[in-house]
Regions:
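Membrane-embedded alpha-helical segments of integral membrane proteins
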Residues: 11-74, 78
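Short nucleic-acid-contacting surface segments enriched for D/E, G, S/T with interspersed K/R
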Residues: 49, 206-219
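Internal/C-terminal transmembrane anchor helices
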Residues: 75-101
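Membrane-interface segments at or immediately adjacent to transmembrane helices
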Residues: 99-161, 166-167
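OB-fold and OB-like beta-barrel modules that bind single-stranded nucleic acids
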Residues: 165-171, 214-224
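Short aromatic-glycine-enriched beta-strand elements
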Residues: 178-189, 232-235
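Beta-strand/loop nucleic-acid-binding surfaces
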Residues: 196-209
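OB-fold/S1-family single-stranded nucleic acid-binding modules
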Residues: 228-252
Length: 256
C-alpha cells in the first residue's frame, strides 16, 4: 500500500522561522546596520551564522511532506507555543524602526560611570597614546581612539591643560552644571548595545542656547580643569561649535 503524505506544520513553522532569521541577518549585513546592535568584531560570527542557517533551512524543507503509516493519524509531538518567542523576535525586528541610544538614557546609565580607574589604580592604567597626545598640537578624537583619549583626559588632565582638542558627540545636560555647560557624549559598546555606557566630557560655551539635548556637534576648544560636584574634572572651553548630522556609526568601540 502506498504511503500517505501529509503536511508537517511544525516543519513549515521551523522553515519559516529559519528563513526569517536568514533574511534578517543578510539584511543587517548588506545595509551595514550590525554596528547598531553589536561590536564590529563579532560581525563575522553573525555572517557565518547566516550561512549555517541555510543548510538547516534546506533540511527542514525536505521534511515538510512526511509519509504517514496507514493506520496512524498524523499528529505533532511538540507544542507550537515553543515557536512563539522566535516569531515575536522576528516580528519586532522587522516592524520596529532602528533605534539609536540617545541623550534620554545617559542619566539612567550614568555618564562616565565605569572608567578604567574604577577597577584599578590610576598608575596601572595603560597609556598607549600618552606621548603622541602630549606632542600633538591638536588632539583629534576619532572613533578608534575615543575611549583611550577619554581615559587620558579623565585621569591625567594636568598633562593636557590648555591643549587644543576637537571631537564629535551629542549634547547632554548634566545635573549640577551651570547654564553655560553641557557634556559632549558618545556611547561606548563593548559587546552589544545592552552593555553600552555613555562616555563624555564637560564643555563650556558662551551661550548654550540653540544646542538642544541630543543634538550632534563637532567642537573645538582648549582643555581645562573646572570644579564640578566637589571635585576637579576635565572640561573643554569651546572656541568653535558646528552642528552635524548623526553619524552613520553613532557608537564607539574600545580597542580589542
Amino acid at each position: 500500500m502506498r504511503s500517505k503524505y501529509v503536511l508537517d506544520w511544525d516543519a513549515i513553522l521551523r522553515s519559516a522561522i529559519l528563513l526569517g532569521f536568514i533574511i534578517l541577518l543578510i539584511w543587517l549585513i548588506k545595509t551595514e546596520q550590525l554596528t547598531l546592535y553589536i561590536n564590529p568584531k563579532f560581525s563575522s560570527m553573525l555572517e557565518i551564522a547566516a550561512y549555517v542557517l541555510i543548510p538547516m533551512l534546506a533540511a527542514q524543507l525536505l521534511t515538510i511532506y512526511r509519509p504517514v503509516a496507514p493506520l496512524h493519524e498524523p499528529h505533532s509531538h511538540g507544542s507550537r507555543w515553543s515557536y512563539l518567542p522566535f516569531i515575536v523576535v522576528l516580528l519586532l525586528a522587522f516592524a520596529l524602526p532602528d533605534h539609536v541610544l540617545n541623550a534620554n538614557l545617559v542619566g539612567t546609565k550614568g555618564l562616565n560611570s565605569q572608567t578604567a580607574a574604577s577597577t584599578m589604580a590610576v598608575y596601572e592604567i595603560s597609556r598607549p597614546l600618552a606621548d603622541k597626545l602630549r606632542q600633538a598640537p591638536l588632539i583629534k578624537v576619532t572613533d578608534k581612539d575615543y575611549t583611550e583619549i577619554m581615559n587620558e583626559l579623565q585621569f591625567f588632565t594636568q598633562d593636557y591643560v590648555d591643549k587644543e582638542i576637537t571631537m564629535t558627540g551629542f549634547v547632554f545636560t548634566p545635573p549640577g552644571g551651570t547654564p553655560r555647560q553641557f557634556s559632549l557624549v558618545r556611547y561606548v559598546v563593548v559587546c552589544c548595545t545592552a552593555d553600552a555606557l555613555p562616555y563624555g566630557i564637560l564643555c563650556e560655551v558662551e551661550d548654550k542656547a540653540g544646542y538642544e539635548e541630543g543634538m550632534w556637534l563637532t567642537v573645538t576648544g582648549r582643555i581645562q580643569q573646572v570644579p564640578y560636584e566637589d571635585k576637579m574634572v576635565p572640561s573643554i572651553k569651546l572656541t568653535s561649535v558646528k552642528k552635524v548630522p548623526e553619524p552613520k556609526a553613532p557608537y564607539v568601540f574600545p580597542p580589542s
